[in-house]
Each structure stands twice: as structure tokens, then as C-alpha cells.
């Protein structure tokens, strides 16, 4: 890779690198706690399972509307979720839909599962991991209800 002329002065480069190291170390330290690491992995795994399940439904829904796309290209819009679930005959209550697919709760800026996943992917600080620990069971319960609803529909549709 060709070496471009730096846009920062040497002391600014050093300060920027030091800031990056500090933030990387904060993430490492936050995830060094075994319980925080377990919560993180449990949540990320279940959210990923829910997301691929939902995006599979969304992909078919979009194709039925004449919009060809792939799962990788899909964006989740919370206001679209009830329509997609109805299309696939998946029964999930409004609170679970909000808990899984909204980014934040109203003006509180408290993370819902999708927002939590985003912040965990970009900067899982101790503060965020503490919020996850407090809300993990709510997230996991809502996600499990979606997973079960999709599984139940798959079984009833084939019987």
C-alpha cells in the first residue's frame, strides 16, 4: 500500500493512536469478565438466529412485492415487521416486536435488542455490558418467542 502523506502532525498521530489503544483496552477489559462475556455471547448468538430467521421471512415478503433482494442486502424497518410476520402467519405480540426490532425505547435511549446488538458490535463497554446484564432476560425471552413461533409455523405448515 502506498504511503500517503499523513494529514495529522506527528504529535496528533501519537495522541490519536493512544486514544485508539485506550478504547481497545477498555473493550478487552470489559469482556474479560466471564459473566459479561457469557452474556455477550448468549445475546449475540440468539440475536443472530432471530435476525436470520426474520430476514428469511422478509426476503420472501419483499419478493412477493416484486422487490428481488438477498438476505445480505435487507434492512430491518421496525414498522414493517408486523406486516412481514402477518404475511408469514407468525404470531408475535407487539411488545416482543418492539423489544427485538426497535433500536431504542422512546426518549430514554435505553437500548432494545437491535440497538443493543449494534452497540455491542461497535463498542462493548462496561456500561453497555451492564445494561445488557440488566435487560438480558427480557431480550432472550422475546427472541425465544420469535424463534419458537417460526419453528411452530414450520411444523404446522408441514403437517
PLM features: residue spans?
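Amphipathic alpha-helical interface elements
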Residues: 2-95
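Charge-enriched, short contiguous segments at helix-coil
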Residues: 95-159
